[in-house]
Design a protein with these regions (language model features):
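His-Asp-centered metal-binding catalytic motifs of divalent-metal-dependent phosphohydrolases/nucleases
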Residues: 26-44, 49-53, 57, 74-83, ...
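Residues at secondary-structure transition points
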Residues: 2-6, 29, 44, 48, ...
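Structural helix-adjacent loops and short alpha-helical linkers that scaffold large soluble proteins
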Residues: 23, 68-69
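Short, well-structured alpha-helical segments
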Residues: 5, 9-12, 30, 69-80
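Inter-helical turn/loop segments and adjacent helix faces that build the functional surface
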Residues: 61-68
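Generic structural marker for isolated residues within well-ordered, non-membrane alpha-helices
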Residues: 15, 57-58
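Divalent metal-dependent phosphate-bond-processing catalytic cores, especially two-metal-ion Mg2+/Mn2+ enzymes
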Residues: 1-24, 35, 63, 81-116
Length: 116
């Protein structure tokens, strides 16, 4: 569980920094980073976790009343696409993918980084 927290908070922080550098909304990047593996850590199942995480967090984000429909769409799209490292998506998608990769590399230096 501690590794999950470290990964999620690290991905959120890294996504925010990358977003600032690239001119992408850093707040949305950080929220995306914090929630990107929601279903994976909730259920322990890795398969389809990106899409399932996006579906699961959509009503949670809406219920807060803090985000517009467009912002929720951007966050959930980035989350849904973060495991698809082979295809280039929209800027927020790419920020999250890169932050996720960096965190995996920083957390586990004994394995190779996911291919980008």
């Amino acid at each position: 569980r501690q590794k999950a927290y470290i990964h999620l908070f690290g991905t959120a922080q890294t996504a925010g920094l990358i977003a600032l550098r690239r001119g992408v909304n850093a707040e949305l990047a950080q929220i995306s980073g914090l929630l990107h593996d929601y279903r994976k850590y909730l259920t322990g199942v890795d398969e389809k976790h990106a899409e399932e995480s996006a579906d699961a967090v959509m009503p949670i984000l809406a219920k807060t009343g803090l985000f517009s429909v467009c912002e929720i769409g951007n966050i959930t799209r980035a989350i849904a696409n973060h495991s698809d490292k082979e295809n280039v998506g929209l800027p927020l998608d790419e920020v999250l993918k890169d932050a996720d990769i960096l965190q995996h590399v920083l957390q586990n230096t004994t394995c190779a980084a996911p291919k980008r």
